[in-house]
Amino acid sequence: MVDDAAPTDNRLEAAPTDNGLDERSIPDSILLAPLRAAIHHGRLLGYAPWLIYAMLMKPRQTVAGIGTYYSIRRSALWRSCVRWLLVKGSSRQPRYIRAQTKPYDPKRQYLLAAHPHGILNYGWWNLFCRFGLNFVDGVQMIMCVAPLVKFYPLYGEIFNDRVTDASKRTIDSILKGYHPAAKTCAAEKQLPLTPAIIPGGFSEATYTAAHPTIEYAYMADRMGFIKCAIEAGVDIIVAYSFGLNDMYSTLAWQRHVRAVKAQAWGLPTVLWTGPYLLGNTPFTEQITVVTFDPFPASKYTLDQLPQAHSDYMAYLKACFDSKKSECGHGHKELEFIGKSKPPNAMATQAPRSRL
């Protein structure tokens, strides 16, 4: 029921962001490296050890400081200042390629599925910082993430009210239009809201940089997001971030056991590091985010869910193969794994890069 991907070469050029700041005026200079490093540490909770230390040493003052932050972070001035810094300090290396044969219709509702997970999916995070939430053909998006992520510093400033949890109940409420953010979008812009999810979740994050020539998609037994799309009658925008798995090295010990536990607990079990054990500073920021023609989930019925899931995985692999060489990853293959389907035993014994 799915045609092969027929990508075009339509790159997103530098453009003014939602803050009115023209990105073309900001060089990707080494002078901005300290700011970029600070942003990486901020988005990956690099402040957590200091926060714990402060709570132990001066708990009252620390709690007061946290309360002050959350009371001001919704102010327009605060968000504008923080987003200005994020735009200025975001790397220019990640790029976006439109591989869809025609632009998405912003008047239609979709479900966007971003692959792979990586370490908090820097490719999309970076592009949202630079271009705003609606850079994908004007489609109005809301990020659906782990429940605690929306409370992280920097995330609220980027996404404003366009971030929520990734539970089925919440995604259904967005697709059916009765989520508060969906109501606001319909009232202010007369456009539907598209939930953006990362189907692999924390389990897939555990497989970041697991193998130098294999990218693992942890979705062999994950059908929930496809079921949501079928029930709502919407198609799925397929997106892949090439290079995302090369940003960090991750702990190999008991990888599949930890991935299964991450799925059961709903908590991350991945431990990562950058070059020279510098933690949140990445090995590379050369990431290419590619979006493809929508997967026609609306053409399936719930009785066809297993077939839709199988077709989706085949379509995702076709999309991956169609662009991997252009994006500098022609040597890689995509392998689907899951709770009951661990990686190929021989592959897991192969040498791992930087691990």
What role is predicted for each listed range?
Residues 25-68:
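Alpha-helical bilayer-embedded segments of polytopic membrane proteins, i.e.
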Residues 93-94, 166-172, 326-333:
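Cytochrome P450 fold signature focused on the C-terminal beta-domain
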Residues 93, 109, 140, 194, ...:
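A residue-level signal for beta-strand positions that form part of recognition/binding surfaces
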Residues 62-78, 89, 106-187, 201-220, ...:
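Catalytic core of membrane glycerolipid acyltransferases/transacylases, capturing the structured
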Residues 2-17, 21, 176-177, 181-355:
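Non-catalytic C-terminal accessory region of glycerolipid acyltransferases
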Residues 55-72, 77-78, 276-278, 325-328, ...:
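Extended, polar/charged low-complexity intrinsically disordered and coiled-coil segments in eukaryotic
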Residues 77-99:
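N-terminal topogenic membrane-targeting module
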Residues 100-104:
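A short acidic-Thr-Gly-centered motif at the start of a beta-strand
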